[in-house]
UniProtKB/Swiss-Prot annotation:
Protein's UniProt name: Adenosylmethionine-8-amino-7-oxononanoate aminotransferase
Biological process according to GO: biotin biosynthetic process
Annotated family: Belongs to the class-III pyridoxal-phosphate-dependent aminotransferase family. BioA subfamily.
Signal sequence residues: none
Alphabetized HAMAP family for the sequence: BioA
Lineage, broadest ranks: Bacteria, Pseudomonadati, Thermodesulfobacteriota, Desulfovibrionia, Desulfovibrionales
Name of encoding gene: bioA
Annotated substrate binding sites: Y205, K340, G375, R470
Length: 542
């Protein structure tokens, strides 16, 4: 048994007061439990030949949603007892609900939207593609948009990544990389059949398929599936605010990388891949790696002959300030996983880029069976690839990365005063990716109790004020579209600041507690789930 200290569990301007003007966004239980009445009212309006008013339409949609839709990462008991925001339209960097309320999209629709909603160039590219073909399989056929996109992606990716394997989500991009690394070593002339294991990191999140969940290091999300999963070599990821070894970043000499080196010495001969989120572990609460850590990991992979898989699903396409996060440390991975922002946030598409060396390991005669027997029905979908090509056009024509730099600097300036708030423990940021960790006591870094649901309440309070954000436990995540203006940045940060003050200093709940026909006024206090220590950063908001 190792005695390494890293074996311990990692614990996971205007209107900045509690009386700020808010949207009239109610949170009671009536609409979600009267499906028949709401649907009947809608039918009666239809029968009378008059359109239902916006309120009736919203009530009907909420009722249907509560009756039929199972939302991801959402406790449906809470959801069905609320009146959720139903998004009906969008415009630029704003979302619009069925009642006509506008909300600034502060998390780019779960980290996907790049250039704003309804960008005319991307809209038109999809319309043009619709006039040709919406989808055609890549099994045995080529497709114009997927061919053009592969050429564009390899041209902008780190040098040496020459081949593109398409899929449809971040999870499947990582899953493909896992199977490629494993199969390569089972069949390639230069492969090593002993290399059957994968190194992954604490607090990692790589998706929701069984392979990607096996890599995950978040017990709240992944623990229950333990019997289904393979066992990776688990290495410590940097967590400077809550270092499990109780070290300080200015004096530790990157001890966590030293622990990775120790594990590599012991397990390197059996590893086919190391999978890492470069620069930032997003779903862990925007945990930022110290400068040089990623470069050091690349060097260790080279030394031990292990493929480095860079999961840039969350950080790719400009969110860290460069097209790809790896660029910031001069790192070229052996495989690069892309999704989310690849289509500008329009349509599901993913890609796994690999080197020519890896691709060559799958070449052989028909009877050699070195084929990569893997793929998805909608792989390389024509509409999605057309959107991705148009998004890359916008990057070039609008000089997105160049014009983003002053707004990144402005974001840093706007965030600085939040360090003075008594319940802000840590602010972590790379590019526009920002995590604001809220704590009960900043001196001791004591987290809030899970049943207080501080991050959830701040999110709802911000929504009442017209801004959409989504927490990771008690870490408030800001990740706006790259098209956000300086004025909108000010609105985003000032609104979140006001919501934090309202909740942590004045007790606002954002309309969280609701009177339910089948339960107490505050169901969370009556029915608080057991949350594993160190997993609180996994809690998300309905």
């Amino acid at each position: 048994m190792s005695t390494s200290p890293f074996n311990s569990r990692v614990a996971p301007m205007p209107h900045d007061d509690a009386t700020a003007p808010v949207l009239h966004y109610a949170h009671d239980a009536a609409g979600a439990h009267d499906a028949a009445d709401a649907a009947g009212a809608h039918d009666a309006a239809d029968a009378a030949g008059t359109p239902p008013c916006a309120a009736s339409r919203t009530a009907r949609l909420r009722s249907l949603d509560a009756a039929h839709v199972w939302h991801p990462f959402t406790q449906m008991r809470d959801w069905m007892g609320s009146e959720p925001c139903i998004i009906d339209a969008a415009d630029g960097n704003h979302l619009i609900d069925t009642d006509g309320n506008r909300y600034l999209d502060g998390v780019s629709s779960l980290w996907t939207n790049v250039h704003g909603h309804r960008h005319p160039h991307i809209d038109e590219a999809i319309r043009r593609q619709l006039d040709r073909v919406a989808h055609s399989t890549l099994l045995g056929l080529g497709g114009t948009p997927s061919i053009e996109l592969a050429a564009r992606l390899t041209a902008i990716a780190p040098a040496g990544l020459t081949r593109v394997f398409y899929s449809d989500s971040g999870s499947t991009a990582v899953e493909a990389a896992l199977k490629i690394a494993f199969q390569y070593h089972r069949q390639a002339p230069e492969g090593d059949a002993r290399r059957t294991r994968v190194m992954a990191f604490s607090n990692a999140y790589h998706g929701d398929t069984i392979g990607s969940v096996s890599l995950g290091g978040m017990s709240l999300f992944h623990g229950i599936y333990g019997p289904l999963l393979f066992d990776p070599v688990r290495a410590p990821a940097p967590h400077c605010y809550r270092c499990p070894a109780d070290l300080r970043p200015e004096t530790c000499g990157m001890a966590c990388l030293g622990e990775v080196e120790r594990l590599m010495r012991h397990h390197g001969h059996e590893l086919c891949a190391v999978v890492v989120e470069p620069l930032v572990q997003g779903a862990a609460g925007m945990l930022v790696q110290p400068r040089g850590w990623l470069r050091g990991l690349r060097d260790l992979c080279d030394r031990h002959g292990v493929f480095m898989v860079a999961d840039e699903v969350a950080v790719g396409f400009g969110k860290t300030g460069t097209m790809f996060a790896c660029e910031q440390e001069g790192v070229v991975p052996d495989m690069l996983c892309l999704a989310k922002g690849i289509t500008g946030g329009y349509l599901p598409l993913a890609a796994t880029l690999v080197t020519e060396h890896i691709h060559d390991g799958f070449l052989g005669g028909y009877a050699d069976f070195r084929t990569f027997f893997h793929g998805h029905t909608y792989t390389g979908n024509a509409l999605a690839c057309a959107a991705a090509l148009a998004s890359l056009d916008v990057f070039e024509e609008e000089r997105t990365l160049e014009t983003l730099r002053p707004r990144i600097e402005r974001l840093a300036t706007l965030l600085a005063p939040l360090n003075d708030l008594p319940h802000v423990g840590d602010i972590r940021r790379v590019g526009v990716m920002t995590g604001i960790e809220l704590v009960a006591d900043r001196e001791t870094r004591t987290p809030y109790r899970p049943e207080e649901r501080i991050g959830h309440r701040v999110t709802l309070e911000a929504r009442r004020r017209g801004v959409i954000v989504r927490p990771l436990g008690d870490v408030m995540v800001l990740m706006p579209p790259l098209s956000i203006t300086e004025t909108e940045l000010e609105t985003l940060v000032h609104t979140v600041r006001g919501a934090i003050i309202a909740v942590t200093e004045h007790g606002a709940d954002g309309g969280l507690w609701t009177k339910r026909p089948d339960g107490p006024d505050n169901p969370d206090k009556a029915n608080t789930p057991d949350t594993p220590d160190g997993a609180r950063t996994g809690e998300t908001v309905v």
